[in-house]
Amino acid sequence: MSDLPGIVVTGASGRMGQMLMKTVLASGKARLVGAVERPGSDWVGRDAGAAMGGAAVGVTVTDDPLAAFAQAQAVIDFTAPEATVQFAELAAQARAVHVIGTTGLEPAHLERLAWAAHHAVIVRAGNMSLGVNLLTRLTQKVAEALDEDWDIEVVEAHHRMKVDAPSGTALMLGEAAARGRGVDLAQARVSGRDGITGPRAPGSIGFSAIRGGDIVGEHDVIFAAAGERITLRHVATDRAIFARGALKAALWGQDRRPGQYDMMDVLGL
């Protein structure tokens, strides 16, 4: 068992953090060696398993990420942008693979991740599921095949607690559509519409976001032309798909050269 890669989960008390820890513990492919929470969290100092309402697992939740990362081969991180860039720098110091599922990252955050990737492996994706990554590849292929007579819209739905929009997955799909079209998403993107907007701009890629209830994640990519429409859709019903994908990425990253990778690399797509 000690030969299995050691994994640290950040944001341990969150829904994804707990799902990630449970997935690692049940996998038989890795060991949970650390759980990180913010200073002041009532989880700090408790056994991670007991804090989740189960049996003790021998891992104490800590607010010292570097100490945790130093004993790990990989860090899985679904937290917030500012925390993620700090974790990236610490994971690079520890030479641990850093798997990032955090969304809402801005250009300044990405610059700091690029620095960290000179020293360690970073696997970052807006979505870790196999299905969504296949959808991303399909979106690019369809966008390549269709001309600008086909309008492209990305519609996503998530639970009421999600704080960023459009989702990281929606942006990933939009980037795929833009690549297929040979355009810059920053120039083509239209996010939401309200009031008198005028006719749709040719070649634009639209985004719409829905927030409500406990929706895990739904994404539609719509290609609409006069008289016909194609919809590519992915529906997530269980967060475990993201946790399984993240663990797969953490294992894949072992012994890779430092650099930035994504789930397409992990899945060989």
From Swiss-Prot:
Protein's name in the database: 4-hydroxy-tetrahydrodipicolinate reductase
Q: Where in the cell is it found?
A: Cytoplasm
Q: Which UniProt keywords apply?
A: Amino-acid biosynthesis, Cytoplasm, Diaminopimelate biosynthesis, Lysine biosynthesis, NAD, NADP, Oxidoreductase
Q: In which pathway does it act?
A: Amino-acid biosynthesis; L-lysine biosynthesis via DAP pathway; (S)-tetrahydrodipicolinate from L-aspartate: step 4/4
Q: Where are the active-site residues found?
A: 158, 162
- InterPro entries the UniProt entry points to: DapB_C (IPR022663), DapB_N (IPR000846), DapB_N_CS (IPR022664), DHDPR_bac (IPR023940), NAD(P)-bd_dom_sf (IPR036291)
Top-level class of the enzyme under EC nomenclature: oxidoreductase
Locate the residues binding NADP(+): 38
Binding sites annotated in the UniProt record for NAD(+): 11-16, 37, 101-103, 125-128
A single GO molecular function term of this UniProt record: NAD binding
